[in-house]
Amino acid sequence: MIGIIGAMDMEVNGLKERMQNAEVETIGTIDFYKGTIQGVPCVVARSGVGKVNAAICAQIMALMYRPKAII
């Protein structure tokens, strides 16, 4: 699984549109979209702007979904 984090909607909307079999899970205030993009298992999230928001989102993603990489 690959984790992808964007700060704003415009950074993740295209990925969410291309995602197949998407399931949404909300943890705290962050929506995580889990599915596949071109057959690759992915989880996509919008963290919000800022280093702290990105770090919180990355930590939750790492603990809950165990991706091989986070972009």
Feature names for model-found ranges:
Residues 1-71:
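Accessory terminal and edge-of-domain segments that mediate assembly/interaction
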